[in-house]
Structure formats: structure tokens, C-alpha cells
């Protein structure tokens, strides 16, 4: 069965928040039209699920991802960066959204 998970809005986000909101609205409408269920998980909840801390920074999230999966995305995708940047942080967040959906929806 189909089910979509999304990370909720970060209320302190900067940049193109209107574009993000616009596109998310369209996505939600299309999912509703197709009767595909949607679960939105807040950024704080994703961080708490991954690390036990709702205010975990990108470094801690990436470190936990490496512990959980054995993959060093930072080294593989952005070896020249001293900080965790995209796409690494987006992939890490997506992993934990999927993991949470698995436990809530698939695994019962």
C-alpha cells in the first residue's frame, strides 16, 4: 500500500519559504486527489527520533546516521566541506522520516 511521509516546515527557515509552501500545497492536493495517505513529521520530532534530542544539529544527525547505517555520506558526497551541507542533511532527514513511517505504518 502507498503512504507518503514529509518533513514538516521549519518555522525558522530562511530563503524561498513561499516556494516551498506552494509546492508542498500542490503535492498535498495531488496526494489527496489520489487518496494516498500522508504523514507529516515535524523537524523536532525527526531529530528526537534519530538522536533522542529534539534540538540536535546537523552534525549530530549525520553522526547518528553513520552509526545506524554504516554510511559516511559527508565523506562520500561533500568531502571538501568542513560542515554538514546539502544534500547530506536532506538525505539524513529523509532516512529518519522513512524509518518512522516504517515503524508507524508498515510494521504496526
Where are these regions (language model features)?
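Phosphate- and other anionic-substrate recognition elements at nucleic-acid/protein interfaces
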Residues: 1-108
Amino acid at each position: 500500500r502507498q503512504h507518503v511521509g514529509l518533513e514538516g516546515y521549519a518555522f525558522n527557515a530562511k530563503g524561498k519559504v513561499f516556494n516551498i509552501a506552494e509546492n508542498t500545497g500542490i503535492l498535498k492536493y495531488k496526494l489527496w486527489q489520489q487518496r494516498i495517505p500522508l504523514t507529516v513529521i515535524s523537524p523536532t520530532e525527526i531529530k528526537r527520533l534519530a538522536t533522542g534530542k529534539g534540538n540536535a544539529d546537523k552534525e549530530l544527525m549525520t553522526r547518528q546516521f553513520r552509526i545506524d547505517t554504516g554510511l559516511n555520506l559527508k565523506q562520500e558526497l561533500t568531502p571538501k566541506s568542513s560542515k554538514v551541507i546539502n544534500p547530506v542533511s536532506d538525505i539524513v532527514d529523509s532516512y529518519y522520516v522513512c524509518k518512522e513511517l516504517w515503524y508507524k505504518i508498515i510494521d504496526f
